[in-house]
């Protein structure tokens, strides 16, 4: 047998098992994206950032401090029409907080996947500074051929807040799966633990907050992200700058920047957020914009 024939035989032998393998289930990249534009500026650290509607995407217990209402949105559109958008709202009903939100990701035309979509609804019970939350999540992935794979899953979250000084949080995501269409999605179970600490009194004119978050996910190594933001506020108006650094989730295809920057303009109960990612699934040098209103 010639060397050329040997290579051909080896190729057919190797190809046999591969062709018999099942088609890999789609992985929803959107689940690896930051929960908000603020979190995007902190390299994705958002599990221990309580009091905003977008928290339901990574830790349902995070909406517990909301006293009346919180509405939040964010987006980014690149020249080739690749798009990322999110919106969420949360409110308090007696001893409970409820929230609902959605995220959408449209990929560049060079990627086989057309888009990702996720909806989530959360309920949180709070007693004192301790909050326990649960969320139901719908996720879908569509490819360029128009095939859509859909699944349902759930999240759990626990948060302990120490007034406005600090918060400790733990979140379990993608716990269980119910297939809606197709063979279901690849939803790696994920555990995150986070800590945030206000280094300055939040009732003063200064702002300085540190957050640290570690995440363990199936088929992925442990990741730790550190974020810092600081600024000044006078009579409800102010400016905050932020930066974060740390490894990004494997579910996002290792395409998110490990280091990010961002900032916010504070306008009383409202704020305008900005974040910059040098590298993202939707392209390079991505600018994200968002807004938040908490009356």
Regions flagged by a language model, labelled:
Residues 3-7:
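N-terminal export leaders
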Residues 15-17:
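N-terminal signal peptide c-region/cleavage motif recognized by signal peptidases
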Residues 20-95, 174-176, 275, 286, ...:
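N-terminal, post-signal peptide beta-strand-biased segments of exported outer-membrane/organellar beta-barrel
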Residues 39, 57, 86, 120-122, ...:
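Membrane-embedded beta-strand positions in outer-membrane beta-barrel channels/transporters
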Residues 46-48, 75-79, 93-95, 102-108, ...:
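Transmembrane beta-strands of outer-membrane beta-barrel pores
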Residues 53, 165-166, 170-172, 183-295:
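Outer membrane beta-barrel transmembrane domains
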Residues 83-172:
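Transmembrane beta-barrel wall of Gram-negative outer-membrane proteins
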Residues 85-87, 110-117, 139, 144-152, ...:
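Outer-membrane beta-barrel translocator domains and adjoining extracellular loop/strand segments
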């Amino acid at each position: 047998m010639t060397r050329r024939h040997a290579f051909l035989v080896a190729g057919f032998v190797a190809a046999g098992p591969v062709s018999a393998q099942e088609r890999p289930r789609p992985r929803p990249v959107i689940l690896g994206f930051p929960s908000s534009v603020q979190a995007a500026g902190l390299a994705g650290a958002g599990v221990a950032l309580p009091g905003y509607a977008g928290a339901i995407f990574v830790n349902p217990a995070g909406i517990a401090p909301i006293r009346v209402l919180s509405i939040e949105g964010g987006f980014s559109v690149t020249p080739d029409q690749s798009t990322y958008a999110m919106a969420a709202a949360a409110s308090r009903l007696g001893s409970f907080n409820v929230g609902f939100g959605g995220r959408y990701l449209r990929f560049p035309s060079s990627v086989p996947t057309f888009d990702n979509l996720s909806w989530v609804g959360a309920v949180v019970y709070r007693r004192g500074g301790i909050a326990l939350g649960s969320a139901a999540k719908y996720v879908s992935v569509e490819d360029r051929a128009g095939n859509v794979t859909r699944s349902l899953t759930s999240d759990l979250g626990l948060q302990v807040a120490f007034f406005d000084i600090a918060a400790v949080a733990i979140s379990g995501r993608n716990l269980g799966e119910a297939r809606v269409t197709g063979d279901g999605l690849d939803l790696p179970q994920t555990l995150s633990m986070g800590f945030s600490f206000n280094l300055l009194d939040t009732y003063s004119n200064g702002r300085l907050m540190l957050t640290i978050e570690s995440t363990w996910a199936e088929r992925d190594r442990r990741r730790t992200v550190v974020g810092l933001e600081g600024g000044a506020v006078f009579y409800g108006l102010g400016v905050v700058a932020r930066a974060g650094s740390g490894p990004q989730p494997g579910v996002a295809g290792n395409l998110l920047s490990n280091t990010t920057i961002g900032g916010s303009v504070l306008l009383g109960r409202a704020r305008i957020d900005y974040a910059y990612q040098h590298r993202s699934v939707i392209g390079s040098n991505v600018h994200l914009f968002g807004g938040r209103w908490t009356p």
